[in-house]
Swiss-Prot record:
Its main location: mitochondrion. This is Mitochondrial inner membrane protease atp23. The keyword Lyase does not apply. A divalent metal cation binds at residues 144, 148. It is a peripheral membrane protein. The keyword Ligase does not apply. GO terms for cellular component: mitochondrial inner membrane. PROSITE patterns: ZINC_PROTEASE. Keywords: Hydrolase, Membrane, Metal-binding, Metalloprotease, Mitochondrion, Mitochondrion inner membrane, Protease. Pfam families: Peptidase_M76. Has a dual role in the assembly of mitochondrial ATPase. Acts as a protease that removes N-terminal residues of mitochondrial ATPase CF(0) subunit 6 at the intermembrane space side. Also involved in the correct assembly of the membrane-embedded ATPase CF(0) particle, probably mediating association of subunit 6 with the subunit 9 ring. Belongs to the peptidase M76 family. One of its GO terms (biological process) is mitochondrial proton-transporting ATP synthase complex assembly.
Amino acid sequence: MASTDDNKPPTASDFAKDAEPQFDPTARTRNWFSILLGTMPPSHQILYREDQYARHEKRDCDKCEEWRDYNLKYSPIVIFMQKNIRDLNGKLDADNIRCRRCPTRITEDGKMVRQGGGFSPEHGIQLCANEMRDSKHVEDTLAHEMVHAWDHLRWKVDWGDLRHAACSEIRAASLSGECRWTREFWTRNNYRVTQQHQECVRRRAVKSVLARPWCKDDVQAVKVVNEVWDSCYSDTRPFDEIYK
């Protein structure tokens, strides 16, 4: 599962803390100025964002499909992964790579979970159109989910096993390009140079494992990622080395 960038969203507990009136999605001008001036409470920011995503769903999906089609035709990493998936008797193309709006999910302990995409062995890849910023973001997300698809075809991954899931998350974060230095620097404000790639991969793998409903807490997520780290981070198949 491809996570969105690492800024922590408000939790559901913010809803209880806010003594503001009920959010009114029809008060567009007032809401816009509240966002602009920084006076909108966190709980209303969540509702405002989800309302905007719903309003612009068609526009977002159309743009996402345009970026998807471009990458399927021109992206070296996407074309490479498509070929290697075909070599394992799999198929990923515009028919089973779909752009959809992905609402924020609230976990049992009240955390807000957003995602950039997902892979299902039965259905293919879903790109979260409301989370995609540009064609490069779609490329990274496609590459991430295609690594999951390749892993599933190659090793018959048991996605209910956290160790299996953690290994694939490590590989997907490492090989997709989402942890390259420029993306860390410009979109996540992480300015470290030494060990930057490893730290990014570990952080994002832990976050993805933690987002799975059957992961108990961050302690378990870190433990599982650490258990499989050495073998999974060093495994760059189907690439000869980390591509970018």
